[in-house]
Amino acid sequence: MPALVLLGAQWGDEGKGKATDLLGGSVDYVVRYQGGNNAGHTVVVGDQKYALHLLPSGILSPGCTPVIGNGVVVDPSVLFSELSGLNERGVDTSKLLISGNAHIITPYNVTVDKVTERFLGKRKIGTTGRGIGPTYADKINRVGIRVQDLYDESILTQKVEAALDVKNQMLTKLYNRRAIATGQVVEELLGYADKLAPYVADTVLVLNQALDDDKVVLFEGGQGTLLDIDHGTYPFVTSSNPTAGGACTGAGVGPTKISRVIGILKAYTTRVGAGPFPTELFDEDGEALRRIGGERGVTTGRDRRCGWFDAVIARYATRVNGLTDFFLTKLDVLTGWEQIPVCVAYEIDGKRVEELPYSQSDFHHAKPVYETLPGWSEDITKAKSFSDLPKNAQAYVKALEEMSGAPISAIGVGPGRDETIEINSFL
């Protein structure tokens, strides 16, 4: 049976939670493979709305085993807050598995993240301030704390001491902050050990055995392709690999096991935080997209920057991820526009460019080249098949498909679980 990767094909916030939830009833495992509680997924089930930051969206599907892989960074306080909130609403969270090799976001990681952004001022990246970047930095510098370290106090103490030797120098001498005591951090982290224990597992072994047993495994990326540390709009990126290759390293599953890679595309474009955004709108259209689309970050609460659909970015996502399908979301938000511009290329220094610029400088100077497509006024939220859509909406979808380089196999026409048109089965 297949292993599928589902990821954002833009700058995140594309509606991955809706897509994962749709597939959750048909898969056996849903796996987060990177990121942390800097991601935000909103899932609507009936009249219930769930905002998830760290937990896989599949936790809302009763027959599914949710997994937090080794590539994820885990803030235990956020984890237990989310679990408690779901339990209070009657959601069974007992099947959750967490990799013992996942790294822990420590209190000093959060502190460093916040004071660094404050210190940088106008030069800041616009992080969520949740300690994600510093935790990944510790991982690369080999001073990170892993989940399994919570079960050996001696090793945990040594690792915290080693990390704070450097962190406290930075906090006291550069940022004029108080030093953080090793004992205080160790005590707090050890306090999570017993609560975490029922969930900790060798998830690499579990997932590979599941695939050998013909189970269906869905790998769920956080953020989006253009926020990838290697393939995104660096330095305005996240600290991990949301792209398809990250599923292999972040979950411990070989690339030959993956059969489909599904990119989630919003029918327009949004971005949170700093960085280039060629199709960004600063007029009433941008404000209307933000208002109608409810474009406010689930994690940050910040208003999202909004713009028209960018086919250059979509083609890039197809290439770097090897996308086999697209899931187009929020098509309903565009209802009411008489004309809908779509960016088909950029103009850079007077030249037309149809692929994403290699140079950061060029991307900053890219101006969108638009083609205008006719809009529609009919309500599409009740559409159950592609033929139910107005002709102009059908033409819009077909145009995006042709420009983006992979078939659009599903379309979101509203926030609800049942407000989806499935054109081709993902399984």
Swiss-Prot record:
The gene is purA. It is an enzyme of class 6 (ligase). Plays an important role in the de novo pathway of purine nucleotide biosynthesis. Catalyzes the first committed step in the biosynthesis of AMP from IMP. PROSITE patterns: ADENYLOSUCCIN_SYN_1, ADENYLOSUCCIN_SYN_2. Its cofactor is Mg(2+). This is Adenylosuccinate synthetase. PANTHER family: ADENYLOSUCCINATE SYNTHETASE. Keywords: Cytoplasm, GTP-binding, Ligase, Magnesium, Metal-binding, Nucleotide-binding, Purine biosynthesis. It catalyses: IMP + L-aspartate + GTP = N(6)-(1,2-dicarboxyethyl)-AMP + GDP + phosphate + 2 H(+). GO terms for cellular component: cytoplasm. Belongs to the adenylosuccinate synthetase family. Binds 1 Mg(2+) ion per subunit. Disulfide bonds: none annotated. GO terms for molecular function: adenylosuccinate synthase activity; GTP binding; magnesium ion binding. Homodimer. SUPFAM superfamilies: P-loop containing nucleoside triphosphate hydrolases (SSF52540). Substrate binds at V298, T299, T300, G301, R302, D303, R304. Mg(2+) binds at D13, G40. IMP binds at D13, E14, G15, K16, N38, A39, G40, H41, T128, R142, Q223, T238, R302. The active site is at D13 (proton acceptor), H41 (proton donor). Pathway: Purine metabolism; AMP biosynthesis via de novo pathway; AMP from IMP: step 1/2. It comes from Streptomyces coelicolor (strain ATCC BAA-471 / A3(2) / M145). GTP binds at residues 12-18, 40-42, 304, 330-332, 412-414. InterPro entries: Adenylosuccin_syn_GTP-bd, Adenylosuccin_syn_Lys_AS, Adenylosuccinate_synth_dom1, Adenylosuccinate_synth_dom2, Adenylosuccinate_synth_dom3, Adenylosuccinate_synthetase, P-loop_NTPase. It is found in: Cytoplasm. The keyword Cytoplasm applies. Its EC number is 6.3.4.4. One of its GO terms (biological process) is 'de novo' AMP biosynthetic process.
